Every structure is written in structure tokens, then in C-alpha cells.
Amino acid sequence: LIILLGGVTVNFILGFFLYMMIMFVWGKTVVTEDNLNSGFKVSEVMQKVGFNDGDKIISVDGKELVDQFEINKMLFTRNISEVQVLSENGERKIINIPENIGTKMMESGQMLSFIPVPDLVIDSILPNMPASFAGLQKGDIISRVNGSKIYGDDDFENSKSVNADYMELEILRGGSLFDLTIPFDSSEKIVGMNIKNQMIKLTKLEYGFFDSLAVGFDYGYWTLYDYVSQFKYVFTKAGASQLGGFGTIGKIFPASWDWQRFWETTALLSIILAFMNLLPIPALDGGHVMFVLYEMLSGRKPSDKFMEYATGIGFFLLIALFLYANGMDVILSLIHI
């Protein structure tokens, strides 16, 4: 039994060890609540649950959420029951999460149900145009247009159409809010300014050697947990359509060489291989372990004929899965041509 589990054990150890060393060498980059000035743009599925555009995540099941980006993964895989949010108006509220939220995310195709909203910043002002006459300056952050909170370029363009002759802006400059009214220069509603999305600030967490061991182990544990939790979706129609083979694995690696990304991907694949090899499918280590445990508990060894048939069936299942996964790669690549 120890020999049969040797390869699986080495893969698990390698994956966890790599995550520990990654935390020690590079640390971890997160997006904190303070980094998200405008909160999240929330999907329709999450709006039905009770979330709203502009929400920030404070805690999940009573524990502070350090990395705001984690919320999508946690909702999908970790069976959380409640989320505390800070609304755009400053109100704190607790939202109860339905048990089937992961299935709803999968079926709707809204896996990224929380998309961080970058600040909309004025990049340049054209001279002798309505924007310059109104007093707008480069670097001003647009908060509201015609009374509506802005969550990206689309909201900005849609809000311009509310009034026919002018646009009311609430801007943030130097920590203070200003209200400005800009008349349109023509029927095309030209105001003479260029806007851009400001990059969301990241916070880097660095760890000493011993701290990195604990943080890396925790990261590896949750990586394994999330992967195992996602496995149940493979047997759904939506999940089966997203299976992939070598092409999908290749896309995990970055287009240009990056040592951190390389080792992160290697650690992930090591943990995935360890889990997959433990599945009770004949021809895999997990299948052999299953038969050995049966022999140990019953005192009877399965017949050679039975083992031959079982191994053949297991091999057939693996080949079928291999062909299906790589076939999906081909189909998806043709669709996106």
C-alpha cells in the first residue's frame, strides 16, 4: 500500500513545498478592500442574491477577506453561508448565500460574478472645449454622471444620454468631491476630454522563512480543496463542456517566461496529478489501492480474470476521457477562429 501511494505522496509533497518556497521568494499579491475605491461590478446572479454594484467584501463566514479577488472562487467551491459587505452608501449588511450558488454560477456562465471596478480617470482635456471651460483637470476621477454611480466605460456612455443638452459630473480631486455641469458642444454630445481606466492598486504581502511555510501550506491546502470541490461540476452539462486536454494545460503557462508563474503552475499541476491519481479507477494508483484495501479487509484476493477485466475497463475510461478532453480543445479552438 505504501509503495502504491508513493507517487501520489511525492506529488503532494512537491506541490506543497513549491507553494511554501513561492511565498518565501515572491510573497503574495492581493487586492484589499482599500484598493477597490469603487467596489465590484456584480453579476445578475449575485444581484438576485442581494449584492449590488459598488459592494466591497468585508468578511466571509465571519472571517476577514484579505484578498477581494478570492470571493468568486470561494462562492463557487467553499459552501459559504454568509458574506458581509460594505455598500456604496457606507452601509454594512450581511447577505445569506444559497446552497446551490455554485451551480447557478456555472449554469449562467457568470463564473466571474464579482468584477473589480477601476476608477474612471480623465486622461487629457482638449483646449477650448466644454470640459476645459467647466474646469475639469487631468487626473480627476469621475464618480457620478447625471446622479448615477459609474462602474466602468459602459455606464459612463449610457449615463450621458440622460440629458440632451448637458452632463452633470461628480468628480473626486485631491480627496474632495466637486459637482460640475458640462454643456454639450453638439448633438453628438462632444465634451472634449479623454478618459481611461486607472489600474487597480495591488498590495504585496511578504513573509519570512518560517511564516512562508505556514502560509504556503495553507495556500496548498485550499488549492487542493478548491480543485476537489470543483470536481463535482464535471458531471454536469455545463462542466463537461469546459473540459480540456493538452491545449488547455498549455494555456495555463504564461506566454512569456516568468519564473513565479512557472513554479505556481508546476505546483498546481503536481497537486492535480496527485488527486487524479487517487481516483478509484482501475489502471490508476487509486484503483490498485481500492483492490488492496478490499483484500486486506476481506482476506480474499480478487481473481486474475476480474483484475484483467477491471483494468481493461479503467483503461478504456481513461482513453475515452483523454479523447473527449482533447477533442473539446479542438472544437473550442475552431469556434474561436
Feature-to-residue mapping (PLM):
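Internal alpha-helical transmembrane segments
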Residues: 1-43, 306-315, 320-322
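Membrane-interfacial segments
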Residues: 22-34, 283, 298, 330-334
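PDZ/PDZ-like domain segments forming the peptide/carboxylate-binding groove
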Residues: 25-66, 106-144, 148-151
